């Protein structure tokens, strides 16, 4: 019995070996057949849904521009006659890599030249000076698209009559209906900063993007109504002719991200743009030229600028902060070498700052080191700068915005908006050397707000209306649920603006300085406008 079981076991082993050998042979034959193209490719299954989809518009044919360099095609070393693992192959690969890196570095190098309109133009029409200016000089958040957190029911419950009236007024703002937001693409890349022109004659919006492009939208334009009737021809082509996109202009004054912009009310024809390419440029809106106003002495110095501001009573002095934690001041009327003053205020980046409009020697900074600090320029040492006071948040603070009433609004990654009322503490009468204790620096109001933007959405920053038409101060900020929220200085929500066609988060939100116009910019370079 023992012998039979032993022979059976050996037989079983042989049988399994034969099966394995056969499987290996079949696998090899299948692979050989596939590589020889014997087996036909698998056909995609047709679905009834795909058959009912409307026919997509054919992509426009690409026309090769004259003088355009041919695109380098990939080619194996064997076809180029280079032996595998040879020194020649290694050297050529290294040279190619270095050439690509050099080209990328060249694209990002700051250009200090003055630019004409044609040198900056990326797309769109030529800017007309008259037409352009218009002539008068919660717990940690998870985004839930289109889910409102404020609406008509909240307005109805408002007991304060003036607050209710303001809520109805701001909530009544309507999305610009001339074109859907997904058709108003003013910049090729993600919008980082926006501003309105101070003119009240018409809404004129400027948007700066990640790659240094500057988009311009004149929202006074009307959608053309075509009366042309086509008897034959392609229907889709006729629709395109009858329904053109809005007229936009895109320029490229910088080589890297435009981080901040400012138009001084007394110089409405000049737009200042600050960039990560370490420069501040001045765009003349009448001459449509751009000149470098400030940059480090050496073109190789990399000092990315994170914010820019100007005092209301001084159209000649620029103030800025950097990603290296520095604060700078420059009087453009004087020699650059003698008139530039800088202070190192933080070891980590300053993400945003603003001057106190009525007393510009006071300013507030927001930093990656989790602080909001209040400073006094009248008593600011270059060697050991000390703030008037500081408040530490749980996570980094993105921006600190001052309003004319002496209140500072900040946004922070701890999912909060904080409002500090220094006006009530008598900031306007403080003498040099005045300091605040930690208790006095605590925020007066904290509002829960989802600030978890992630990698692809621009950081949310509050922005006050400079000259509101009532005594109630208000600011706007993007909402991760694809809205723009408006709050009062006491933390009361005034509105949650949305609308059809908003397909991305309007993360960059700005108020017009005096009119109830609000614009939001998205990561796809598109604009939403409420008026």
Swiss-Prot record:
SUPFAM superfamilies: WD40 repeat-like. It comes from Aspergillus clavatus (strain ATCC 1007 / CBS 513.65 / DSM 816 / NCTC 3887 / NRRL 1 / QM 1276 / 107). WD repeats lie at residues 186-227, 253-293, 300-340, 345-385, 392-431, 454-497, 500-531. The keyword Nuclease does not apply. The lineage of its organism: Eukaryota, Fungi, Dikarya, Ascomycota, Pezizomycotina. GO terms for molecular function: DNA binding. PANTHER family: WD REPEAT-CONTAINING PROTEIN 76. Keywords: DNA damage, DNA-binding, Repeat, WD repeat. One of its GO terms (cellular component) is nucleus. GO terms for biological process: DNA damage response; regulation of DNA damage checkpoint. DNA-binding protein that binds to both single- and double-stranded DNA. Binds preferentially to UV-damaged DNA. May be involved in DNA-metabolic processes. Belongs to the WD repeat DDB2/WDR76 family. Signal peptide: none annotated. Residues 37-83, 218-264 are annotated as: Disordered. This is DNA damage-binding protein cmr1. Residues 53-64 have a biased composition (Basic residues). It holds the Pfam family WD40. InterPro entries: WD40/YVTN_repeat-like_dom_sf (IPR015943), WD40_repeat_dom_sf (IPR036322), WD40_rpt (IPR001680), WD_repeat_DNA-damage-binding (IPR050853). Residues 233-245 have a biased composition (Acidic residues).
């Amino acid at each position: 019995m023992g012998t039979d079981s032993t022979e059976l076991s050996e037989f079983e082993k042989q049988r399994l070996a034969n099966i394995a050998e056969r499987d290996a042979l079949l696998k090899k034959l299948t692979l050989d057949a596939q590589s020889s193209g014997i087996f036909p490719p698998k056909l995609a299954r047709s679905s009834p849904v795909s058959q009912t989809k409307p026919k997509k518009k054919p992509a426009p044919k690409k026309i090769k521009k004259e003088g355009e360099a041919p695109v380098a095609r990939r080619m194996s070393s064997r076809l180029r006659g280079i032996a595998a693992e040879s020194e020649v192959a290694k050297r050529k690969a290294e040279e190619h890599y270095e050439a690509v890196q050099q080209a990328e570095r060249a694209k990002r190098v700051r250009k200090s030249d003055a630019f004409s309109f044609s040198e900056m133009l990326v797309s769109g029409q030529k800017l007309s000076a008259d037409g352009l200016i218009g002539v008068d000089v919660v717990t940690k958040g998870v985004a839930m698209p289109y889910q409102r957190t404020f609406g008509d029911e909240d307005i109805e419950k408002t007991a304060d009559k003036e607050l209710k009236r303001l809520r109805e007024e701001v909530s009544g703002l309507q999305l610009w209906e001339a074109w859907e937001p997904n058709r108003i693409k003013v910049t090729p890349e993600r919008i980082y900063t926006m501003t309105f022109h101070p003119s009240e004659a018409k809404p004129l919006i400027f948007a700066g993007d990640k790659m240094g492009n500057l988009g311009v939208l004149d929202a006074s334009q009307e959608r053309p109504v075509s009366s042309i009737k086509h008897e034959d021809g392609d229907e889709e082509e006729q629709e395109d002719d009858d329904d053109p996109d809005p007229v936009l202009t895109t320029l490229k004054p910088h080589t890297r991200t435009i981080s901040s912009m400012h138009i001084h009310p007394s110089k409405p024809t000049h737009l200042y743009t600050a960039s990560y390419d370490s420069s501040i440029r001045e765009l003349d809106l009448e001459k449509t030229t751009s000149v470098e106003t400030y940059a480090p002495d050496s073109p190789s110095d990399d000092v990315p600028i994170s914010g820019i501001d100007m005092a209301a009573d001084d159209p000649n002095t620029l103030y800025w902060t950097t990603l290296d934690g520095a604060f700078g001041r420059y009087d453009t009327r004087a020699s650059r070498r003698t008139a530039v003053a800088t202070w190192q205020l933080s070891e980590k980046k300053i993400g945003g700052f603003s001057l106190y409009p009525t007393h510009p020697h006071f300013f507030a900074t927001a930093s990656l080191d989790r602080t909001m600090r209040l400073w006094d320029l009248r008593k600011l040492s270059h060697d050991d700068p000390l703030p008037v006071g500081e408040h530490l948040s749980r996570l980094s603070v993105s921006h600190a915005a001052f309003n004319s009433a002496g209140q500072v609004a900040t946004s922070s990654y701890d999912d909060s908006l904080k409002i500090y009322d220094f006006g009530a503490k008598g900031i306007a009468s403080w003498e040099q050397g005045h300091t605040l204790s930690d208790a006095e620096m605590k925020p007066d109001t904290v509002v829960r707000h989802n600030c978890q933007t992630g990698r692809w959405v621009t950081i949310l920053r509050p922005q006050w209306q400079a000259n509101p038409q009532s005594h109630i101060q208000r600011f706007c900020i993007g909402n991760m649920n694809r809205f723009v929220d408006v709050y009062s200085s006491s933390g009361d929500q005034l509105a949650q603006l949305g609308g059809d066609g908003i397909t991305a988060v309007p993360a960059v939100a700005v108020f017009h300085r005096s009119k109830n116009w609000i614009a939001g910019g998205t990561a796809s370079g598109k604009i939403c406008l409420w008026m």
